[in-house]
Amino acid sequence: ACQENADRLLAKDNLIRVVPEGVQGIRKLFRDRYRLQRFGRGGYIRLCLRTRAPLIPCAIIGGEEASPLLYRFDALADLLRIPYLPVTPTFPALGALGLVPAPTKWRIKFGEPIQFDNYGPEAADDDLLVGRLSERVRTTIQSMLDNGLQKRRSVWF
């Protein structure tokens, strides 16, 4: 992610989407589905603090069943210089066709905006504060996921 581009977009009142879980979120095994991974180093929080932009938490339910990751060939992925090499119920058995996701129903939930007006731009340099705020966002989204999963009737509809 490029902080300068994010600053420029926010200065023009554009919306941006950040995925603080990063690659760790897409390379987690199926048994770990809907358990959020650590949220990186807090660059998105620093951005919100510097620009005073609100953060709208978003939880997506359904995507983790679309391509269930059963195993990762980490050593081979490292040799190929790719983030991960998946083994799913259909890949590599079906070749490239096995990379096509299953048709699951996705539910996208948006939470209440989290404001950072109580902090000045200098708060972006406070690593402890950034860590606490990042964990607050992570637990908010995890709670949204947990609630959505409890209400879901099926993966398919």
State what each model feature region is.
Residues 1-109, 113-115, 121-124:
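Soluble catalytic domains of membrane acyltransferases
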Residues 101-157:
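C-terminal terminal-subdomain/extension
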